[in-house]
Amino acid sequence: MKTLVGKKTVAYNQNGEYFVNPLNKKIQKYEISILKEIAKKYDVDGIILDWLRFDDYKMDLSKSTRNAFKKKYGYDPITISFSTNNAKRRQWNSWRTSQLASYVKQASRSVRQTKKDILLGAFILPPEFTECGQDVGKFKSYIDVVLPMSYYKDWDFTPSWVYGKNSGILYDT
């Protein structure tokens, strides 16, 4: 996965770990083949998808992602001002969330063709983490289980952020 550092795109590295681009069609095809293999060869009740997201608005800025976005919108996303909330950044994020939803839809259909009764789920970040490019509303109809990542202590929130009666991660998702 590529991110923007200054004016250059570089491989995203988090504490020595590198991540694949969930929007890359070749990676999607490969990952779906693994999901189908698991569903076919192993006695599993379900499969949970993880890392259906990005760490920042500035991701993924690989050539394939940039070209796909530019083909649809006519400009290179590398030109977006990611540090401010603006129309182009919102357009970029909406496009990324739609692309991830399309991948979840394709994965769901492929796996369920292999094993009809398998449960599918996804780990999701809280709704206010918009920079991650997740919109569960766009893909919830393709999965059976949503697993909110509610690490309130890690992010300096109170338990009500997760368990609130009128708001909170569980209420909002």
Show the residue positions of the predicted features.
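Glycoside hydrolase catalytic-domain groove-lining segments
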Residues: 72-173
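Generic structural "secondary-structure junction" signal
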Residues: 21-22, 54, 153
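Aromatic- and acidic-residue-enriched segments that line the glycan-binding/catalytic groove
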Residues: 1-14, 51-83, 140
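Conserved, mostly hydrophobic/aromatic
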Residues: 31, 38, 47-50, 111, ...
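A structural motif
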Residues: 43-44, 143
